[in-house]
């Protein structure tokens, strides 16, 4: 029996995003560009450790009480409490009324996993709606917990803009009380965010059907460089849904603190206004603790301590804000550089959507065929959907990338005419 025990296990394809990283690493060509994985790079194409993070690490190491002891099951309180403040805002009614539950998670993915486990236990029959397109891992996270997913229109490819009517129609047609996963800012993969006015329409529509909103907040500070501006959608949702349904928030510090490998994040839940919250809050917290205990026992401490220092030390907080502006402004600069090079080359099509988008990514509009040719002919690596990590561009490679895109677009434009 032991010889055949695993014979029926299916071989799965490599993860789409990490597969790109692997192929890029194996590519021996002298000139190559990785626009696949979502990680910030400086203008030399190197990983950047934020100055605020370096300073926080020094404080931690110089502390006489520094140790590697276990954290509690729900994480480091100085992280979770301060993380909640930057996403909800200290003036939020949810804070004033003690309606917020916060636990530490393994970055944003871990927070989404906690959400999925919670939904599967308490709301197993609710549909989970994801934007079309969405982050490649969203569907798997929810479906692996036995939840059913559906999609709502988001990206209008013809106009390279938000399909607001399709979005609102999907909200109205969804079964009452469904779960809508919303990207709070710097939408992945499109880089296209609703305007403030559009967010009001979206949240009002969600409230009218008693839906549950889950905000995936992976890029706070990356869309505009301003934490408060990037928290607008979450704060609006908490305000407008306060008497309708709880609001779930999955928060990551991978991007805005450069803590990719340390897996620092938080799961937050803003409860509705109701008299029973004095009993509901400890009950829900106990269930979240049980999920965490059975999965990871307790969350990792080192990265959590670093981010906590950023959030609770005024001079480090100030430097961190400057660091976020440094990253977001360089990405914006690269958006304009890429668009300008394409315009200068006369590349067929309109490329203004690149500068109209925000955050780390651009949904370029390139087809899977074009992306394949970019990789095979020019060693420029993108996700098959056409998503490009603008953070991978710099002064030394942006012109090369523009020329590669120009060649590929012209190749398929000419081929289509033959």
Curated annotation (Swiss-Prot):
One GO term of the biological process aspect: 2-oxoglutarate metabolic process
UniProt-recorded Gene Ontology molecular function terms: L-aspartate:2-oxoglutarate aminotransferase activity; pyridoxal phosphate binding; ribosomal large subunit binding
Parts forming coiled coils: none
Catalytic activity: L-aspartate + 2-oxoglutarate = oxaloacetate + L-glutamate
EC number: 2.6.1.1
Activity across pH: Optimum pH is 8-9.
Post-translational modification N6-(pyridoxal phosphate)lysine, affected residues: 255
Residues that, per the record, bind L-aspartate: 38, 135, 188, 387
Keywords associated with the record: Acetylation, Aminotransferase, Cytoplasm, Peroxisome, Phosphoprotein, Pyridoxal phosphate, Transferase
CC annotations in GO: cytosol; peroxisome
Pfam families noted in UniProt: Aminotran_1_2
Disulphide bridges: none
Modified residues (Phosphoserine): 389
Gene3D superfamilies, per the entry: Aspartate Aminotransferase, domain 1, Type I PLP-dependent aspartate aminotransferase-like (Major domain)
Cell compartment(s), UniProt: Cytoplasm; Peroxisome
Similarity section: Belongs to the class-I pyridoxal-phosphate-dependent aminotransferase family.
Function: Plays a key role in amino acid metabolism.
Note: In eukaryotes there are cytoplasmic, mitochondrial and chloroplastic isozymes.
Protein name: Aspartate aminotransferase, cytoplasmic
Native source species: Saccharomyces cerevisiae (strain ATCC 204508 / S288c) (Baker's yeast)
Lineage per the UniProt record: Eukaryota, Fungi, Dikarya, Ascomycota, Saccharomycotina
Encoding gene per record: AAT2
């Amino acid at each position: 029996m032991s010889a055949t025990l695993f014979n029926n296990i299916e071989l799965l394809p490599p993860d789409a995003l990490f597969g790109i990283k692997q192929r890029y690493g194996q590519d021996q060509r002298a000139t190559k560009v990785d626009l696949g994985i979502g990680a910030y790079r400086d203008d030399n194409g190197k990983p950047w450790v934020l100055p605020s993070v370096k300073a926080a690490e020094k404080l931690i190491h110089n502390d006489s009480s520094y140790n590697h002891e276990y954290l509690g099951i729900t994480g480091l309180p100085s992280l979770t409490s301060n993380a909640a403040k930057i996403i909800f805002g200290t003036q939020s009614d949810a804070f004033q009324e003690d309606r917020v539950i916060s636990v530490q998670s393994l970055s944003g993915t871990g927070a989404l996993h906690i959400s999925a486990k919670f939904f599967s236990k308490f709301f197993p029959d609710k549909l989970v709606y994801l934007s079309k397109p969405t982050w490649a891992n969203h569907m798997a996270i929810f479906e692996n917990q036995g939840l059913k997913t559906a999609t709502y229109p988001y990206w209008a490819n013809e106009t390279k803009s938000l399909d607001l009517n399709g979005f609102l129609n999907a909200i109205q047609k969804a079964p009452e009380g469904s779960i809508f996963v919303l990207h709070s800012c710097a939408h992945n993969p499109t880089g296209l965010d609703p305007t403030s006015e559009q967010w009001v329409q979206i949240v009002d529509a969600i409230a009218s059907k008693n839906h549950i909103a889950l905000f995936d907040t992976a890029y706070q500070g990356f869309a505009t460089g301003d934490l408060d501006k990037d928290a607008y959608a979450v704060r609006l949702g908490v305000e407008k849904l306060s008497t309708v349904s709880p609001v779930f928030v999955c928060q990551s510090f991978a991007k805005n603190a450069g803590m990719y490998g340390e897996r620092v994040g938080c799961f937050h839940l803003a409860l509705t206004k109701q008299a029973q919250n004095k009993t509901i809050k400890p009950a829900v917290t106990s269930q979240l603790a049980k999920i965490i205990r059975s999965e990871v026992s307790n969350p990792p401490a080192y990265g959590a301590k670093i981010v906590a220092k950023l959030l609770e030390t005024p001079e480090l907080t100030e430097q961190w804000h400057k660091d976020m502006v440094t990253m977001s402004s360089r990405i914006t600069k690269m958006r304009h550089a890429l668009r300008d090079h394409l315009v200068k080359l006369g590349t067929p099509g309109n490329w203004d959507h690149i500068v109209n988008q925000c955050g780390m990514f651009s949904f370029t509009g390139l087809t899977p065929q074009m992306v394949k040719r970019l990789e095979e002919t020019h060693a420029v690596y993108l996700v098959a959907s056409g998503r490009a990590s603008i953070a991978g561009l710099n002064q030394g490679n942006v012109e090369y990338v523009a020329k590669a895109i120009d060649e590929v677009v012209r190749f398929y434009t000419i081929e289509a005419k033959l």
